[in-house]
Amino acid sequence: MAFAAAATSTIRLATGILILPQRNPLIAAKEIASLDRISGGRLDLGIGVGWLREEFDALGVPFEARGARTDEYLAALRVLWSESEAEFHGEFVDFDPVYCQPKPAQQRIPILVGGHSNRAAQRAGELGDVFFPAERPVETLLSLHSLAKEFAEKAGRDPAKIELWTSSNGDSSHLDQLVEAGVSQVMVPARPPEQLAERYAQLIADYDLEDA
């Protein structure tokens, strides 16, 4: 991503996704802020709690507490990025006043919360800026987004500011359904090179982008 940041000037960059509870939050804060700084404030931070127990076992991180750990790490990151001398005392991360540099270029790095459970919807509503479930039936996406906005309102946040992103195979009819459902951004997963030219040529034709 650092290479992509250096080689571009306008596209936004996003992690999709960073398994946050597997990271040291103080180191992650510096790495993420550095990337946002060198990109000129173009980073969206996609995070998730993880699902593969063996990864957590290999790292010595308790699998069962990954959700609570993620929530606390998010709170710690916000403190490290916003305070000149940051201090945080929690169950999973605890540090006395420290200086954490560099600070992000953006005043607030957008947090994309991945997942498709009710708990993920709650995390997005309470702590995130974007809810980013993987491709699901449109009705499921609408239900999850509604739940995320409910949790945002309960947390004293503006529910209208919780965006909904998802992924798609790029089928034009599916994309139209997502737009109608209020999805603001769609990720079309990468494919083998031999498939890309044909697929994107079809998308260009479907959306009349030849002269765009």
Where are these regions (language model features)?
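Active-site-adjacent structural elements that line small-molecule/cofactor binding pockets in enzymes
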Residues: 1-212
